[in-house]
UniProtKB/Swiss-Prot annotation:
Name of the protein this chain belongs to: Enolase
Family: Belongs to the enolase family.
Cellular localization per UniProt: Cytoplasm; Secreted; Cell surface
Cofactor binding, per record: Binds a second Mg(2+) ion via substrate during catalysis.
Gene giving rise to this polypeptide: eno
Known role: Catalyzes the reversible conversion of 2-phosphoglycerate (2-PG) into phosphoenolpyruvate (PEP). It is essential for the degradation of carbohydrates via glycolysis.
UniProt EC number: 4.2.1.11
Length: 430
C-alpha cells in the first residue's frame, strides 16, 4: 500500500562543505524516496527561510540540526499514514503545520526535503520515472541548458561584478548535442583563458572565475571561445547573464556600485548598459538586471528590451505566485526563475510555473550555488515542459548530476523527446 510508514532526516553536506538537510520517506509497500536540499549564496529578500542553527562553534553557525529535528520530531508524526501519492494534500499539511508566511517556523529546508522525498517515494511506489509522476504522459521537452561558464559576484572571488555569464546552445538538434556543444565551449574557454595568462580555477557553479578588465570583457572572451570551438555565436549559441544586481545595489544612494570597474550607475544607466551589450553581443537572456525592489527600473528595462530579450526574475519573483502576480500586473519582466527552495514545496513551485505560462512568461528551472548530488530539478524541467534549465557549467559532479539525469531521460523518451532550441523563447521577437 502507498501509506507512509517512516520519515527520517539527517544533516549532510552540500557542494560548498556547508550542512544541508537530507530526508528519506518510506511507504508500507517498500516505496522509497530521498531528497537533498540546495542552498543559495545570493538570496532574495523575500525567499522562504532556510533554518540554520546559529551555533558558531559548529559549522560556523550553519548547522541544520534544528531543521532536521523539525522533520523527525514535528513533521514525521503528522505524515505517518498519509497516502504518499497525495502530494497536494501533503504539501498543504506542511504549509499549515508551519503556519508562517515565509516557513520560518519549521524551515523551508525542512519542508522542501519532505516535499521532494514524498514525490520520489510516490514515483518509486508506482514504478515510474519521477518526471512522469510529476508531469504525466505529456512530459517530453528536454530543456535548453543555460550553462554558467564565467562566474563572478557572490559566486567567485574575483573582480567581476556580474554574477554569471552563460551560454545557451539553441542551435542543437537535441539535448545530447546541446550538452556536447556546451562542454566543448567550456574546454575552449579554458584554453583561451590560459593563453591570456588568466586563472582557470572554477567557482561555486563550475564556471571559470578569472579577474577581467571589465564585465564586457567576459562577453568578449566567451564569444572568442565559442568561435574557437567551431560554433557560430548568435546562430548556434546565444549568451545569457545573471547580474544578481541586488548584490551590488546600494540602498543608501539608490545606485548600482560596480566595484570591479569602479563605476556607479543609476537604474536608467544600467538599462542603457544592458541595451548597449545586447546590441554588441548575442544576448538572449538577462536575469535580475536590477535590484529586487527597483520595480521602476525593471519596468523601464522591460519596456526597452522585453520584446527581444528574456528578462528573468529571480530575487524579483522568488518562485512566489504573489510576487509574480505583481510583476505580471505591472508589466515587469517576461520570465521567472524557478528555485524550489525559494518557496519550499513542489505544489507551490508548480503553481508558480503554471501562473507564468498563463501570462505568457517563460520559466527557467534552476539550481542553487550550494548544490548536492540530488537531480530532482532535471525531472522538474521535463515534467513541466519548461524548456530551459540553469544548472551551472559542465564541471563538478553537483552540476553534472543534473545534466547526466537529462541524458538518461532523453534516452528513456527516445523518439518522443523534444528539444525546442530557439523556439523555447516563444514570447520574443527572435
Amino acid at each position: 500500500m502507498p501509506y507512509i510508514v517512516d520519515v527520517y532526516a539527517r544533516e549532510v553536506l552540500d557542494s560548498r562543505g556547508n550542512p544541508t538537510v537530507e530526508v528519506e520517506v518510506y511507504t508500507e509497500s517498500g516505496g522509497f524516496g530521498r531528497a537533498l536540499v540546495p542552498s543559495g549564496a545570493s538570496t532574495g529578500e523575500y525567499e522562504a527561510v532556510e533554518l540554520r542553527d546559529g551555533d558558531k562553534d559548529r559549522y560556523l553557525g550553519k548547522g541544520v540540526l534544528t531543521a532536521v529535528n523539525n522533520v523527525n520530531e514535528i513533521i514525521a508524526p503528522e505524515l505517518l499514514g498519509f497516502d504518499v501519492t497525495e502530494q497536494v494534500a501533503i504539501d498543504k499539511m506542511l504549509i499549515e503545520l508551519d503556519g508562517t508566511e515565509n516557513k520560518g517556523k519549521l524551515g523551508a529546508n525542512a519542508i522542501l526535503g519532505v516535499s521532494i522525498a514524498v514525490a520520489r517515494a510516490a514515483a518509486d511506489f508506482l514504478q515510474i520515472p519521477l518526471y512522469q509522476y510529476l508531469g504525466g504522459f505529456n512530459s517530453k521537452t528536454l530543456p535548453v541548458p543555460m550553462m554558467n561558464i564565467v562566474n563572478g559576484g557572490e559566486h567567485a572571488d574575483n573582480n567581476v561584478d556580474i554574477q554569471e555569464f552563460m551560454i545557451m546552445p539553441v542551435g542543437a538538434p537535441n539535448f545530447r548535442e546541446a550538452l556536447r556543444m556546451g562542454a566543448q565551449i567550456f574546454h575552449s574557454l579554458k584554453s583561451v583563458l590560459s593563453a591570456k595568462g588568466l586563472n582557470t580555477a572554477v567557482g561555486d557553479e563550475g564556471g571559470f572565475a578569472p579577474n577581467l578588465g571589465s564585465n564586457e570583457e567576459a562577453l568578449q572572451t566567451i564569444v572568442e571561445a565559442i568561435e574557437k570551438a567551431g560554433f557560430k555565436p548568435g546562430e548556434e549559441v546565444k549568451l545569457a547573464m545573471d547580474a544578481a544586481s541586488s548584490e551590488f545595489y546600494n540602498k543608501e544612494d539608490g545606485k548600482y556600485h560596480l566595484s570591479g570597474e569602479g563605476v556607479v550607475k543609476t537604474s536608467a544607466e544600467m538599462v542603457d548598459w544592458y541595451e548597449d551589450m545586447v546590441s554588441k553581443y548575442p544576448i538572449i537572456s538577462i536575469e535580475d538586471g536590477l535590484d529586487e525592489n527597483d520595480w521602476e527600473g525593471h519596468k523601464l528595462l522591460t519596456e526597452r528590451l522585453g520584446s527581444k530579450v528574456q528578462l528573468v526574475g529571480d530575487d524579483l519573483f522568488v518562485t512566489n505566485t504573489k510576487k509574480l502576480s505583481e510583476g505580471i500586473k505591472n508589466g515587469v519582466g517576461n520570465s521567472i526563475l524557478i528555485k524550489v527552495n525559494q518557496i519550499g514545496t513542489l505544489t507551490e513551485t508548480f503553481d508558480a510555473i503554471e501562473m507564468a505560462k498563463r501570462a505568457g512568461y517563460t520559466a527557467v528551472i534552476s539550481h542553487r550555488s550550494g548544490e548536492t548530488e540530488d537531480s530532482t530539478i532535471a525531472d522538474i524541467a521535463v515534467a513541466t515542459n519548461a524548456g530551459q534549465i540553469k544548472t551551472g557549467a559542465p564541471s563538478r559532479t553537483d552540476r553534472v548530476a543534473k545534466y547526466n539525469q537529462l541524458l538518461r531521460i532523453e534516452d528513456q523518451l527516445a523518439e518522443t523527446a523534444q528539444y525546442h532550441g530557439i523556439e523555447t523563447f516563444y514570447n520574443l521577437n527572435k
